[in-house]
Amino acid sequence: MHLRSKTVQQLLSVILSVVMVLSMLPMEVLAQETPPVTTPMDLTATTEDTSGDGWSWTQSTKTLTLTGLTLTVSDDSTHALILPDGATIDLADGTASTLTGGSRSTVYSSGEVKLRGSGSLTVYGRGWRSATLDMFIPGTLTVEYDDPDGGAVLKTDEGTEGAAICANVTLDNGILRATGPDFASADDGSSVGLRGRLTTHGSSVEAQLTARTGYASYGLYFDKQGSGRGDTWTMGLGKVTAAAGHALSRYSYGLYVDYSSVNALELDGTQLTAMGGESDQYGSQGVFAGE
């Protein structure tokens, strides 16, 4: 009995030692991290359900569910993520996904894309080449609110030539943060937070549209993406902040309404804050409307 008791004590001592060693390890060593994906994802060519580390695709509903995807591609790739028209990006609760890279755009779609869920998505553009865009969706991006304490969040930074987001955007009780590029020279191009039509629905809407340094600087360049001139457009409930940065050669406008493509812009309950920045040669205004 004495020998058995001694053996048990030795085993307990070993177990305790292992526990103490594990407790001293950093949490990131113990955590199971999702490995990064380095190959561009083109879901327009997919005909069946498929999945990978941090993501899954449901073909019948065209739904991409992100559960902690880290997608990083090189500048040799034109786009990081390509989605079909009518696709939905579902951000799983409590997860954070990051998309990086692409010489022309990080996320591309030929039509409408809907973003929903209570997780977060961060998009970092790469490339900084002529006529490239951080995120280009020439349809409608819809952000749907799911979480009463947060909602889907889209953040863009390190944009390229032009706009962080070039799309007609609909916010339905969601949160949108778009930050344009920061150029050192006027020859590099203009900095725009969001270029396109912005529609807001719901008192929980928050849109933070920020431009930085460039040839010109516009927080929100309000025009119609696509051909033809649009009718009178209305922004509804929600908080919209449009802030311009430093314009090296042209104008710095918080909100610029392009009347060559939009007949008129009306605010229906919108809490709008528009701020112009510094302009080296031309004017700076919070709001400007013209052609």
Predicted regions located by residue number:
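A composition-driven surface/loop motif
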Residues: 32-291
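In a subset of proteins, long, contiguous C-terminal domains/tails are tracked
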Residues: 5, 16, 32-35
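C-terminal segment of classical bacterial N-terminal signal peptides
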Residues: 21-30
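N-terminal secretory signal peptides that target proteins for export/translocation
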Residues: 1-8
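Sec-dependent N-terminal signal peptides
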Residues: 8-19
